[in-house]
Amino acid sequence: MNQATKVRLSGEHFQKILRHAEAGYPNEACGLLAGVEQDGVRDIREVSLLTNVDASNEHFSMDPREQLAAIKDMRARGLRPLGNWHSHPETPSRPSAEDVRLAYDPGATYMILSLRSRIAPNLNAFRIREGRYEWEILELYD
């Protein structure tokens, strides 16, 4: 990728992710991102909140039934699956070695919310491919 992709996320969707991550703390929380993409800009229009069936603070696995239902719902509403998000309860907002190893879609946006500082949660977006991650430009708006 020569140029970073821009990802737009509303404050409302950020709060939705944050509330789900805080409710799941100290375990990782997870979900899917849906929206539209045009001219290198990904506009996230829906955030799905899924169950981490691993119930772990070091890794996550999305509930397969919830994942399928969320994808069906987003497609029925004319949205595309654009990626996923998960929280890091105690580590920085960047992909761990396990995140990089398990990344399955080089075209997906991977958002990571760090709750390491509970006072100032930190959300970042990445692309992961060929064993490496690249930052995406994340724009939060009202």
What residue ranges belong to the model's regions?
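Short, well-ordered beta-to-alpha junction loops that form the rim of enzyme active sites
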Residues: S87
